[in-house]
């Protein structure tokens, strides 16, 4: 089975572009690849699934213990003959200026070779020195080969012998400069696949390029490993559905971890998707609703105009419908929300607070979320790893939890009670008690409210 981590010295080196190119090229060569993303980024896996029709999941050593990460990797790689893990940030960049939860830590946990993406513009021998620094910084480094990004054929011809001689690592090829294949991004990362003009043509262009410029024989030989084997964890063991849970899914609410949805199914949930933008009523017979993050700020006017759905949701929550709202879903439940132009629109009005644009990342990064009291999902004093990633804030963040970063900074946040959780932190449900608790609350609600 072909398996490797794609990493780089720093963000902006072209990992995501090369990931798309390699996945598409592997498909053209007859492989059935899957993809993984190191860290908490839900946007790239969503892009892999939508644009490339490739199964893609997150592997995060802050969210999950090493054994859980190995189990997730083995489970989601099963049935595929190639697995590509895209690293986040720089190769060794992890939690709080350590290597913890870094791309290197993931490669070390899974025992995978690493292909390093480097941009050679403006350097030659110095590039070899930088690569050797990465190669020797930790033992083992797992570095197995080099890929040159945004590189001309002539420069590749000059640099490849130098880099191989000075670093001992094979140069497996290059991706040329392709301005016509750029995938656009916005304030939280890549645009969704549906929004990128000419996306399939761009992906085809990338695949054709690396099909011609990579040494596939050497690449496949270096990355061919036995398929991973790990016992299927309980939190992914299939279960018969016992309750219907509605999950918001549309252009405004699209930031979900696929592993979270699978963990809910394994806990007994039948997931029913609906659109706060386009549907006028909640799905029938549900015992709970999950409002994930996304881009509600880009669709605030349309969300305001769908008053029937907003009213139905508000009434259901007031009746005690078990509800989880993360980040964008949390903003949707507030009193109002500004769009990108600063125009405020009424929202569901379940919670206090006006959502507003800040213009930069707010409280960005990992944190530990500790509840002040027992609630539907949480138990007092039970810390849970979370992640915040948003450019909008609200005038009422709540105080049911304390969020604390590794450097000691902390702040109050979130709303919670016996049937409710809402807040900016994104939760990673797989391997936790959250799915079982949510499903239990949903079943209990339906028993008390037979015709919700």
Where on the chain are the PLM-derived regions?
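Phosphate-binding active sites in nucleotide-utilizing proteins
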Residues: 241-307, 311-318
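Structural motif
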Residues: 5, 84-86, 115-117, 147, ...
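Cysteine-nucleophile active-site neighborhood
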Residues: 296-374
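A short, charged/proline- and glycine-enriched loop
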Residues: 1-2, 238-244
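Internal gly/pro-rich beta-alpha loop/helix module
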Residues: 124-237
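C-terminal and late-domain segments of enzyme folds
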Residues: 107, 212-213, 239-241, 253-263, ...
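ATP-dependent carboxylate-amine ligase catalytic core
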Residues: 2-110, 118-145, 150-157
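Beta-strand->loop->alpha-helix junctions that form or flank phosphate-binding loops
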Residues: 37-38, 171-179, 270-278
């Amino acid at each position: 089975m072909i398996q490797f981590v794609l990493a780089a010295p720093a963000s902006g080196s072209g990992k995501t572009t090369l990931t798309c190119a390699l996945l598409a090229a592997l498909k053209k060569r007859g492989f059935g690849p899957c993809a993984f993303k190191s860290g908490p980024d839900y946007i790239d896996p969503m892009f892999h699934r939508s644009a490339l029709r490739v199964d893609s999941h997150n592997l995060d050593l802050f969210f999950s213990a090493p054994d859980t990460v190995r189990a997730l990797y083995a489970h989601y790689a099963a049935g595929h003959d190639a697995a590509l893990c895209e690293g986040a940030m720089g190769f060794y960049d992890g939690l709080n200026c350590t290597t913890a939860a870094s791309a290197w830590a993931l490669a070390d946990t899974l025992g995978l070779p690493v292909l390093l993406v480097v941009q050679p513009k403006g350097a030659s021998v110095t590039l070899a020195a930088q690569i050797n620094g990465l190669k020797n910084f930790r033992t083992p480094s797992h570095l197995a080969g080099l890929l040159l990004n945004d590189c001309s054929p002539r420069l590749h011809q000059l640099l490849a012998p130098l880099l191989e001689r000075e670093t001992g690592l094979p140069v497996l090829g290059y991706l040329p400069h392709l301005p016509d294949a750029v995938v656009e991004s916005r304030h939280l990362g890549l645009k969704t696949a549906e929004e990128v003009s000419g996306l399939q043509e761009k992906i085809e262009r990338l695949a054709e390029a690396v099909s011609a410029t990579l040494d596939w024989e050497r690449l496949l030989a270096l990355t061919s490993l036995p398929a991973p084997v790990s016992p299927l964890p309980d939190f992914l063991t299939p279960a018969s559905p016992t309750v219907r849970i509605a999950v918001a899914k549309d252009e405004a609410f699209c930031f979900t971890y696929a592993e979270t949805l699978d963990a809910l199914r394994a806990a007994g949930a039948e997931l029913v998707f609906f659109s706060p933008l386009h549907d006028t009523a909640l799905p029938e017979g549900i015992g709970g609703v999950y409002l994930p993050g996304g881009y509600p700020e880009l669709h605030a006017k349309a969300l305001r105009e769908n008053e029937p759905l907003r009213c139905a949701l508000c009434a259901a929550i007031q009746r005690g419908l078990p509800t989880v709202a993360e980040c964008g879903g949390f903003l949707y439940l507030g009193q109002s929300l500004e769009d990108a132009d600063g125009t405020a629109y009424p929202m569901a009005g379940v919670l206090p607070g006006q959502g507003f644009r800040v213009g930069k990342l707010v409280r960005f990064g990992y944190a530990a979320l500790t509840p002040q009291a027992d609630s539907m999902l949480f138990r007092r004093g039970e810390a849970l790893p979370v992640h915040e990633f948003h450019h909008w804030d609200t005038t009422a963040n709540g105080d049911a939890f304390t969020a604390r970063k590794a450097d000691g900074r902390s702040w109050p946040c979130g709303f919670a009670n016996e049937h409710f959780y809402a807040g900016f932190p994104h939760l990673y449900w797989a391997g936790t008690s959250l799915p079982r608790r949510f499903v239990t609350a949903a079943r209990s609600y339906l028993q008390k409210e037979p015709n919700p």
